């Protein structure tokens, strides 16, 4: 059976959170990123139409302020590890099927990783990010950065609401126009791919791991496709049909190619854990949390 395999990037393919690593080029940037990520989580919980993962747009003022450019993104991306077994998985699946990446990642990072594992640009759906076009803006955020470092959790929402409301109107427009490919936009990408391939959603295998993937996983599962969570968190696992926790992606290629998924799970005795996500979800979450921490460390805590 011909399948359209759609993988998230950060987590399943590479453990690096590229935006987090990029912010670490800025003094105290990792801490600032973590505060903004918490703000993003708050908005995702409180705002009905808000899409989680918007952190990638919200950090823009800080990247612009410190003149971070496309070469910086590429340089950070070059240091990103590729998860064990990914190249073999892509090679195996591309022999009979179509392989796509759907990622919140900035395009510079997504294309760099794609090149390293044999996925061309045209098969990657990601966040367009022409940051060099914004480097002529001069904004001083030193005082704001000091305040952010001292923020208590209960003050995060109020501070950032005011910060983004009062920010320079041109910068605000850039933030608003940055379309981060997470949430519903990942689902949109699935349908664009189906139109391009002239296939229906039952041919889709979607693989994700976090809050930005759950809508894609849910849509594919409900429409008869195959949805898989890899080293996922509590936001993604309940919406997938199957789950795999491990340190090597190669078994996932064999699972995807298997004709009887439930039988494969019963017989599996290799490294890692396969589950059919229909019961014991809390147990599955604990197993995945362990492997997520092994594989992603700090990045795995960021939504």
Task: Give the location of each predicted region.
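C-terminal cap/substrate-recognition subdomain and adjoining C-terminal extension
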Residues: 84-88, 95, 105-303
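Alpha-helical substrate-recognition element adjacent to the catalytic core
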Residues: 2-139, 243, 247
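Short, small/polar residue-rich loop motifs at catalytic or cofactor-binding pockets
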Residues: 1-2, 224
